[in-house]
């Protein structure tokens, strides 16, 4: 009995399956499942030169990116063409090239700002000090001696321009001035020394020591003359000298004292 019940149940299940298959038909058969294929399709977009005016066309891919993304420091195109040649042509959305952020509008006599906005700046330059010169393209003052010294001191190197014809002339002129100045100083010193010497000799009152020398010379001469006369008189009294010899000796002593005085 148990076996008959199991056989009937199996037969009933087979019949039910056949009936379900007939009702659904081949259309209800489940299709084999498969993962959808995600392929990157490169959209060619508009043809070359047909991007909107407010966009930038990537060179390789042809994609159009907003013009504000151009030269913003971020590579938006796959080939990085939106970040190329940014120092040459950093243009804004209205296609008017603006100065770089690192180089703001300045008073350099060059129209680098849009709509001439640099003309509205306060571009009055303060004058350079005496002995200085101003660089041509930069508001920088440097000493005049730095001109044509073989080393560019101006940011634009304008202090070393046109030095082929001026350098030798400037050097010769400076050397001649230096030589003339040295000669003048030497002549002035020699002249001053001579004037001081002559003035000291011609005007004893300007040299206090001259009085002492003259007084000492006069006293010494008087002592010598007096001593000579006393000696000669003593010798004469002892009979050693004739009268004529006394006169000659006195005369010679006087002449000797005068010579000594003139030498002093």
Curated annotation (Swiss-Prot):
Any GO molecular function: cargo receptor activity
Signal sequence region: 1-28
Top-level lineage group: Eukaryota
Subunit structure: Interacts (via LDL-receptor class A domains) with TCN2.
Disulfide pattern: 51-64, 58-77, 71-86, 128-141, 135-154, 148-163
GO CC terms, sorted: plasma membrane
Gene3D superfamilies: Low-density Lipoprotein Receptor (4.10.400.10)
Pfam families, per database record: Ldl_recept_a (PF00057)
Single GO biological process annotation from the record: regulation of vitamin metabolic process
Residues that, per the record, bind Ca(2+) 2: 146, 149, 151, 153, 159-160
Protein name, as recorded: CD320 antigen
Parts of the chain that traverse the membrane: 213-233
Keywords: Cell membrane, Disulfide bond, Glycoprotein, Growth factor, Membrane, Metal-binding, Repeat, Signal, Transmembrane, Transmembrane helix
Glycosylated residue positions: 122, 195
All residue ranges annotated as the LDL-receptor class A domain in the record: 50-87, 127-164
Function in brief: Receptor for transcobalamin saturated with cobalamin (TCbl). Plays an important role in cobalamin uptake. Plasma membrane protein that is expressed on follicular dendritic cells (FDC) and mediates interaction with germinal center B cells. Functions as a costimulator to promote B cell responses to antigenic stimuli; promotes B cell differentiation and proliferation. Germinal center-B (GC-B) cells differentiate into memory B-cells and plasma cells (PC) through interaction with T-cells and follicular dendritic cells (FDC). CD320 augments the proliferation of PC precursors generated by IL-10.
Localization annotation: Cell membrane
Membrane topology according to the record: Single-pass type I membrane protein
Binding site for Ca(2+) 1: 69, 72, 74, 76, 82-83
